[in-house]
Amino acid sequence: MRTIRALVTGFALLLSAASAPAEDFPARQIRLIVPFPAGGPNDIIARVIGQRMSEIIKQPVLIDNRGGQGGVLGTEALAKATPDGYTIAISSAGALAISPTMENVAYDPLKDLQAVTLVAKVPEMLVVATDVPAKNMAELVALAKAKPGKLNFASSGPGSLPHLAGELLKLTAKIDIVHVPYRGAAPAMNDMLGQQVQMVFLDLPILLPQIRSGGLRAIALGAPERAPTAMEVPTTTEVGMPELQTENWYGMVAPAGTPAPIVAVLNRIATEAMQVPTVKEKLAIQGATLIGDSPEHFHTFMESEITRWAKVIKDAGVATEK
């Protein structure tokens, strides 16, 4: 009898110890790593979500910009952080699904990171320079087939989502267009406006002002539905290329080993922040659709994205460091 009582007491103490951290969490400031410089889409999304999280938990949420290597450096810093819930990150598709497939990064997103929630998706849009004689996808594909190897597409860098979206276009449409990589979206945009390159995939909010001003011509949007801010632009499905649907996405992650009860608290706080109307409004301006799913669903989503882009990389023969 004493043995049974001792076991029951010990088990109760273990349960109490396991739940205590979550009951007290968060008791101090949370550091939210953004693996990109201030001012970009990743940074804006993180700041809007982080500010509301801070108001919910009555604790500061410090934004820590750790830009470099397309989001890899900041994500590496997160993977090495103490797994106590006080250091988290909102990272992107590039750092969580593409770079680990192409580069020798110091983390495995599925083993070294703990999924918390998929925060938002932002569709990629295909645009052409105004001197390109194509007003829609059918005309663009016909032009490329008539001039194999003569048309080109810009990207924000080798292995970036815009790069792989361009490679996916080549595979899907069976066309030969040349990749022209840049060091970031801004120089790619400058040369698009200067008609030095002919087409590019980029996040919708980056392109929208230039489409409105007539500086670029929209061809298709890589989203399931048309964007409220650009209803005149058809989706890739509407133009007959559903497999070309391409969205940048941003997810909240913690270091692997973060206790499940703390992950649950982080998930609850983040998803609650995403339900606030002002948060939705601010991020809708950025072209972002808020998600807010479970850790398990986000982990499965990351797996599917890694598989998808690994296949594109292989099928397109994209050079990798691995």
Protein language model regions, located:
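Bacterial N-terminal signal peptides that target proteins for export
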Residues: 1-11
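N-terminal signal peptide c-region/cleavage motif recognized by signal peptidases
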Residues: 16-19
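N-terminal (or domain-start) structured segment
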Residues: 22-112, 150-152, 158, 174-199, ...
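Hinge/capping helix and adjacent helix->loop/strand transition within the periplasmic-binding protein
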Residues: 80-86, 93, 101-187, 236-238, ...
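Short, Asp-centered acidic motifs that coordinate Mg2+ and/or phosphate
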Residues: 85-89, 125, 198-199, 217-218, ...
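C-terminal lobe and pocket-closing loops
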Residues: 121, 207-275, 304-307, 321
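Mature extracytoplasmic/periplasmic domains
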Residues: 276, 280-299
